[in-house]
A protein has these predicted regions:
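Flexible, acidic/histidine-containing loops and adjacent segments that form or flank the divalent-metal
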Residues: 1-3, 64-67, 72-79, 90-206
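Conserved beta-strand hairpin/beta-sheet module of binuclear metal-dependent hydrolase folds
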Residues: 1-79, 206
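Solvent-exposed loop/turn segments at secondary-structure junctions
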Residues: 10-13, 31-34, 85-89, 128-131, ...
């Protein structure tokens, strides 16, 4: 089976995948307070936090993962993918959020999840300043990105986490690692990354 789990906290994106051999993949892990100004600033009404405002969205994600992680994962996530550096995908930052005692990064969203359920490999779009937008130099995005880098540095030293940049067209980034020979036809391909899109021809992109 290939399992797709959508973890709905009403505070941003989070998807959890279990590949046929038990390899795990987490895409995004948003986090925000129940009444967050940054998310409200997009002009859309916020849905009520799920299951309630009494628990952080990252804690909801962590609890869900602990329940569904397959035994073969040994309590870790094989691959995490951070699609981009916006708060509704990686977690927003506010002054009242706690700081990780050892790593010095703010605990929220993907940094909260990754500090409590180790990631073996993290894929992202690469540097915030590669093909930048106006958000790369203003607002909360640079602060979120620098906080993410602090987390990556700590997790690399503590858990051996590898940070990699996703490549459009690549079919060898997310691979089954437990018993791939049992599910040979199955594969995962990166279709787009950082402005590049797979052109449908082997591993090339444009």
């Amino acid at each position: 089976w290939f399992e797709i789990h959508s973890i709905n906290t009403a505070r941003g994106e989070c998807f959890f995948y279990i590949l046929p051999d038990g390899t795990t993949l987490l895409i995004d892990a948003a986090g925000a307070n129940p009444n967050d100004d940054e998310l409200e600033g997009h002009g859309y009404p916020l849905a009520p936090a799920k299951p309630s405002g009494d628990i952080s969205s990252s804690q909801v994600i962590i609890d869900y993962l602990h329940h569904y992680l397959p035994e073969v994962s040994e309590g870790k996530i094989d691959y995490a993918v951070l699609t981009h550096y916006h708060g509704d995908h990686m977690g927003v930052l506010t002054d009242d959020m706690p700081t990780h005692e050892d790593g010095g990064f703010t605990i929220c969203g993907i940094t909260d999840v990754g500090s409590r359920i180790p990631f073996k490999v993290v894929y992202d779009r690469g540097s915030l300043y590669d093909r930048p937008s106006k958000n790369s130099f203003s607002g909360a995005t640079p602060k979120r990105y620098e906080n993410y880098l602090k987390y990556i540095e700590w997790s690399s030293k503590t858990h051996g986490t590898e940070r990699r940049s996703a490549v459009a067209g690549a079919a060898d980034e997310i691979r089954m690692i437990h018993s791939p020979e049992s599910y040979a036809p199955f594969s995962v391909r990166t279709v787009a990354s950082n402005g590049n899109v797979w052109d449908g021809k082997e591993d090339r992109s444009s």
